[in-house]
């Protein structure tokens, strides 16, 4: 879709608390730095990466084209796979990702909520894949 000039990506580090609990907060700090580096390397110059809260990041991209946003997501996932295969770290990073396009009539709050909601859809899918017995009859 075109016609707007901003897209957003919200990224949450999956199981970040476990990294802190198992390896300590210093290693958790390293994981946050590594995560930011993985994202930054995958983004175009038109993107701005920000730490939003705790283990969440937001990326704003000067495009309203959903294909360009999805390209960024694919690049981030590819960069993440490469990091996990080559870093030698004792932890593996995993991201849950949600996107949105800032559309006419949206507020900044609704833009953030849409990214967050889409990110939690992915996070919940990952949880059900790891713990299938938790899934309800209705799905």
Language-model segments: which ranges?
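Short beta-strand-to-loop capping motifs
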Residues: 59-64, 101-103
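Gram-positive cell-envelope targeting signals
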Residues: 10, 138-139
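Conserved long alpha-helical elements within nucleotide-processing catalytic cores of c-di-GMP signaling
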Residues: 1-7, 14-44, 50-54, 58-59, ...
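Conserved Rossmann-like nucleotide-binding pocket used by diverse enzymes
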Residues: 9, 60, 98
């Amino acid at each position: 879709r075109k016609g707007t000039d901003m897209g957003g990506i919200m990224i949450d580090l999956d199981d970040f608390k476990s990294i802190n609990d198992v390896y300590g907060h210093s290693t958790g700090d390293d994981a946050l730095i590594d995560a930011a580096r993985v994202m930054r390397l995958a983004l175009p110059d038109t993107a701005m990466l920000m730490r939003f809260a705790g283990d969440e990041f937001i990326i704003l991209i000067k495009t309203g084209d959903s294909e360009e946003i999805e390209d960024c997501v694919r690049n981030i996932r590819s960069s993440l796979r490469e990091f996990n295969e080559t870093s030698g770290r004792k932890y593996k990073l995993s991201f849950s990702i949600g996107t949105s396009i800032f559309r006419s009539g949206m507020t900044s709050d609704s833009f953030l909520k849409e990214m967050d909601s889409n990110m939690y859809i992915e996070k919940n899918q990952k949880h059900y894949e790891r713990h299938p017995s938790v899934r309800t009859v209705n799905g």
